[in-house]
Amino acid sequence: GSWLVMRLMEPGYMVRATVRDPENLKKVSPLLELPGAKSKLSIWKADLGEEGSFDEAIKGCTGVFHVATPMDFESKDPENEMIKPTIKGVLDIMKACLKAKTVRRLIYTSSAGTLNVTEDQKPLWDESCWSDVEFCRRVKMTGWMYFVSKTLAEQEAWKFAKEHKMDVITIIPPLVVGPFLIPTMPPSLITALSPITGNEAHYSIIKQGQYVHLDDL
C-alpha cells in the first residue's frame, strides 16, 4: 500500500490513503514523509470492519485501489476474523464507490490463491479458474483461510460489479516481495524469509506458489 501511494504521487495524482488509526504516527509518518506528500497526500480514517467508514474518503475520487485484507494465519476464529470481514470489506468499498457517483474504476488486489488452490493441479490457469473453497476448508493447509476469504470476496465483487455495471479490474498476484517503506515487516516478507528464519508454517506457503517483485506488479 505504501508503495502504491508513492507511485501514484510521482506523476502528480492527488491521493487519499485510508488507515485504521491516523493518530498512529509510527505507521503514518512514513507516508507523510514521502516526496510530494505535503501537497498530494491526505490521510483518512477507515476500517474494513466498520460499515460505511469508507464513504467520506471515497467521495469525490475518480479511481479507487483496494489493496488491504484481514490476514492472520493463527486466527482461532477464521470465519469471523478473516473470511466474513474480507467479503464484507470489499462490498462495503464497492457500495461507497456507487454512493460517490464520481468513481470511474475500482482496481481490486486479489490473489493467485483465488485460482490455483485445488486438489487437481492444472497445467494452465486463466480467468475461468477458481480455487476449490471446500477443498481448502477440508484440508486446512497453511493459509487456507486466506485462500477461502480472497476467493469468496472476489466472486462476490464480480457479482456486485455485474449487477451495478461497475468498471472493476482485479489483479491476481502471487506472493509480493521487495523493499518496504513502513517500519514493520510486511507479512509477505515474513513468508519470503522463512527459509532463513526457519518458520515452517510460512515456508509451506512458498512451496505452494510463486513470487512477484512489487515493481512488476
From Swiss-Prot:
One Pfam family in the UniProt entry: Epimerase
Any idea which GO molecular function terms this record carries?
dihydrokaempferol 4-reductase activity; flavanone 4-reductase activity
CDD domains reported in the protein's UniProt record: FR_SDR_e
Provide a GO biological process annotation: anthocyanin-containing compound biosynthetic process
Q: Enumerate the catalysed reactions.
A: a (2R,3S,4S)-leucoanthocyanidin + NADP(+) = a (2R,3R)-dihydroflavonol + NADPH + H(+); (2S)-flavan-4-ol + NADP(+) = (2S)-flavanone + NADPH + H(+)
**Stored InterPro entries:** Epimerase_deHydtase (IPR001509), NAD(P)-bd_dom_sf (IPR036291), NAD(P)_dehydrat-like (IPR050425)
Keyword NADP belongs to the record: yes
* Top-level taxon in the UniProt lineage: Eukaryota
EC number, as in UniProt: 1.1.1.219, 1.1.1.234
Classification via Gene3D superfamilies: NAD(P)-binding Rossmann-like Domain (3.40.50.720)
Its pathway is: Pigment biosynthesis; anthocyanin biosynthesis
> What keywords were assigned to this record?
Flavonoid biosynthesis, NADP, Oxidoreductase
Which of this chain's residues are annotated to bind NADP(+)?
K27, Y146
Q: What does this protein do?
A: Bifunctional enzyme involved in flavonoid metabolism.
Which family does the record assign?
A: Belongs to the NAD(P)-dependent epimerase/dehydratase family. Dihydroflavonol-4-reductase subfamily.
What protein name is recorded for this chain?
Dihydroflavonol 4-reductase
Query: What is the native source organism of this protein?
Result: Medicago sativa (Alfalfa)
Give me the gene this protein comes from: DFR1
